[in-house]
């Protein structure tokens, strides 16, 4: 992150004989402390969002004048430099507020277009309690999964390549359901996403996860593991508030392991924030 901010010769517009001289010209040193209260392998895009947060803080402190699009682009570069791979969807999801449809064009340089969608399905009293997030206590990091999927794409794997236009059309269907405030359609499309995830990666739904889903699937319109799958959090769309109560009771009484628990989720209306004290 500091390299991308110019604290390395390859990324600096000015030349310095040493880092000490550069910091002297800058006027101070920099100490960075990180805290992420989310477990590794959560599937919530935490590594990308944390990287964006660090870049956003450095941007503010150093007066680099990056906007949110710049921060998201530099996050992609940072993750490539760290060899973690990944795309841009996680940081755009976290840095920008609310519900969004993200669209990009083909090409090496990606400049996603952000279109905001209404939040009615997530905040209206009829639907708010139907969105459930459950930590499974099972972890699986995304790096190796991403490498396998990208490799399959480059090797022209037919099953993988045929999924791409389906996933694009599915995103547009989901956007339309949200625009129309069609809760039933939204929930079932979440379930379709889960089916597509499993077709993309056979390790998405291991037996331990399948056992959790089996207990609650009859009370849901749809469910999926966010991110690469295989562990982390389980997002569920209950059929109605009463069904949501049943899901909470079942998974609380029959927790698969001591780490498993429900966590409260709300929609961010601010996105990335940087404050000074």
Protein language model features and the residues they cover:
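Conserved glycine-rich beta-strand-loop-beta hairpin in the small C-terminal domain of fold type I
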Residues: 232
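Glycine/charged-rich beta-loop-alpha catalytic/anionic-binding loops adjacent to active sites
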Residues: 28-40
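A generic structural signal for short coil/turn motifs at secondary-structure boundaries
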Residues: 40-44, 199
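C-terminal nucleotide
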Residues: 2-25, 35, 62-64, 68, ...
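DPxDG-like acidic metal-binding loop motif
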Residues: 43-64
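Short glycine/threonine-rich catalytic loop with a Thr-x-Gly-x-Asp
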Residues: 44-46, 223-228
């Amino acid at each position: 992150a500091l390299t991308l901010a110019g604290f390395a010769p390859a990324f600096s517009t000015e030349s310095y004989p040493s880092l000490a001289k550069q910091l002297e010209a800058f006027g101070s040193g920099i100490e960075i402390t990180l805290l992420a209260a989310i477990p590794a392998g959560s599937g919530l895009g935490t590594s990308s969002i944390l990287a964006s947060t660090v870049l956003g803080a450095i941007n503010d402190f150093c007066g680099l004048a990056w906007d949110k699009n710049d921060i998201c682009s530099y996050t992609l570069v940072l993750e490539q430099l760290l060899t973690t791979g990944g795309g841009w969807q996680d940081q755009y999801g976290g840095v920008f507020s609310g519900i969004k449809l993200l669209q990009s064009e083909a090409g090496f340089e990606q400049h996603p277009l952000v279109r905001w969608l209404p939040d009615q399905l997530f905040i209206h009293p009829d639907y708010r309690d139907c969105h459930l997030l459950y930590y499974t206590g099972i972890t699986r990091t995304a790096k190796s999964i991403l490498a396998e999927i990208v490799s399959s794409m480059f090797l022209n794997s037919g099953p993988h390549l045929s999924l791409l236009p389906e996933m694009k059309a599915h995103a547009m269907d989901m956007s339309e359901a949200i625009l129309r405030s069609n809760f039933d359609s939204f929930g079932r499309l979440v379930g379709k996403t889960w089916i597509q995830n499993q077709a993309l990666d056979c390790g998405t739904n291991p037996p331990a996860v399948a056992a959790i889903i089996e207990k609650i699937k009859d009370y849901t319109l749809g469910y999926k593991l966010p991110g690469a799958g295989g562990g982390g959090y389980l997002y569920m769309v209950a059929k109605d508030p009463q069904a949501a109560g049943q899901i909470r009771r079942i998974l609380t009484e029959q927790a698969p392991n001591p780490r498993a628990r429900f966590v409260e989720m709300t929609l961010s209306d601010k996105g990335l924030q940087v404050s000074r004290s």
